[in-house]
């Protein structure tokens, strides 16, 4: 039966029994003759994770009331009279503490006021003020031309040598340079100049606070950082500063814990969902629920996006399993059948698949149908055609990669990336997030189809996620050639060494970020919060793959951050 032809109240959203249509023995293909996945089991205790849904946390009514009071204090502070540079620095601190979402309108209002102010003496000639102003305005959708930095160049067109001693100015210039577009050569020069000089002085900076900020920035620029992860680090860092604003710090801690308590309940419910699917018993695929929840928090940590996180985590966990079926477990014939079932969005033919794979297919259908049912109930919009199309497109890209591997075909880098920017899978999660958050008056079949068509913003998001994923591939994996990656494609195509290939891919990352930065200012039918989701998924990838594959294998850095962001609340002083 074709799912599109059924009634929304019957088979369209019908939950399929995971025991239905599964051949008892004929489809029970033994795993004995299949390649071993060698995936490590999850290091997370799922009984503990499930308990988070009901466990009382440290956030009580007293703390909630206190947070509300402090929020008003901070709001008054932001609207107060102060020097322009001090106002910019306050906004910067508020954003880095993870509080931007609480003061969105106030931040835009204050920045626009500073932008419209005809007096420019306060920032012209001051590298720190010029760069901080440039970055904050561009971050918040107000365009500033790159030529504001021309004044810091000498007659030969180079950045003035005396700027090498201005560490704070260099740090602000470094952060600003990551907001550049294609063709903005001055910002490219600024990035190179600031990076070189900060690396030269990072071990000899007299101020411990400034030294830590410089090293942190060189490890990962702000524009590439996930807001929630950055906030957890910066709250501790801000507490060390001499000029800390006590009530702002207190509010940041309270708000972090309030949001964390919401995330914990969501995580507990998702852990229960995962166990109830029975997929945790399948030994040939990865269990990545926790990693996907961390990614969900990178994509949209704000409390109002609970449904976005819920869908993203469920889809992400299933996507990983489907990816493992195509990469490791399934035969080419099974993958053809799998792809056909998803393309038709019809479970007829599932009896031709082994039971393990059939369970994954049925869970895919059940989860997509449940998400679609919720959207129809809550928003009056039939999303099944769009979610089904996104799943089908994804599976077709997986199948193409599987055929490349089985036939020994070596695609060019361009050919690989054209397929890979979709096979990285974020289009599916982004389409679903769009359906959940787009304003109802703008949500139409055509608008959803536009997102599914992979427009430029979504394309850059997919490309960057793909490139980061590939850079996380180990040298051993590349040498084995188990899975096709962009690094291998470039090596095969050009004869380059792995080191040279990695540098080339890193260069593509910088160029793709410039394209995405430009997209944020172009006229488009896409709007917030969807635009932000596209950028934030990339920031999640940057974290997981920065030091290797922290997604497939729970490394110490990913587990430590997961504990501090999701499990352990920030300690409050006794008087708090």
UniProtKB/Swiss-Prot annotation:
Binding site for (2E,6E)-farnesyl diphosphate: 286, 323, 327, 466, 469
Keywords recorded for this protein, A-Z: Lyase, Magnesium, Manganese, Metal-binding
Pfam families: Terpene_synth (PF01397), Terpene_synth_C (PF03936)
Protein's GO biological process: diterpenoid biosynthetic process
Enzyme class: lyase
Cofactor(s) listed: Mg(2+); Mn(2+)
EC id: 4.2.3.-
The record's note on its domains: The Asp-Asp-Xaa-Xaa-Asp/Glu (DDXXD/E) motif is important for the catalytic activity, presumably through binding to Mg(2+).
PANTHER family on file: (-)-ALPHA-TERPINEOL SYNTHASE-LIKE, OS04G0344100 PROTEIN-RELATED
Function: Produces a mixture of beta-bisabolene and alpha-bisabolol, along with traces of alpha-bisabolene and farnesene isomers from (2E,6E)-farnesyl diphosphate in fragrance biosynthesis.
Name of the protein in question: Alpha-bisabolol synthase
